[in-house]
Amino acid sequence: MDGEPVFVTGGTGYIGRPLIGALLAREHTVHALARPGSEAKLPGGALPVAGNALDASTFAAAIPHGATFVHLIGTPHPNPSKATEFQRVDLGSIRAATAAAQQAGVRHLVYLSVAHPAPVMRAYVAAREEGESLVIASGIPATILRPWYVLGPGHRWPCLLIPFYAVLRWIPATRDSAEQLGLVTLDAMKAALVRAIEAPPASGVRIVEVPEIRRT
């Protein structure tokens, strides 16, 4: 799979930039969507595509036929007060992404979703679940990854919860939830995305949960 074209949305973000760097190091050709004027924020070596992630007509024609489409866009620093943004940005962007992917004839769609069910962030989870439904309905072979929180630079406050997770894993009634909603590192997330990109399912949809994301 090395060298295959990849189209990335969210390439200027926290996960997108390191992922693009990893893909370029593996000799993939990376086309990356960015807002007009933000192209310089993409890693060097990526081929910039200026467009609006909420409007498929602004970027669908720039997706190489047969490429893998990786959708990483989401509301920055999500919290319960951002329910309107989850509908507008998270759901709106995957709606545009699936439409563009179908139009372009992509071979594989990779969607960064979120672990669920979850007892908190219900509006966020609901938007991502609806996004998953759009991916499935597209009919494109797809991989859906479901992390809960990705630890990395500027995103480390959940480290305070690690002792709490350890206790939950010892309790039979909460063990499965603790694993499903566990924390993953940025490096593990990047590696899981690369694996997904380079090993697409022949058909249907593959779901990658937290325990598999943690595998390095």
Which positions does each model-derived feature cover?
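Conserved Rossmann-fold NAD(P)-dependent oxidoreductase catalytic core, especially the SDR/UDP-sugar
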Residues: T75-S138, T143
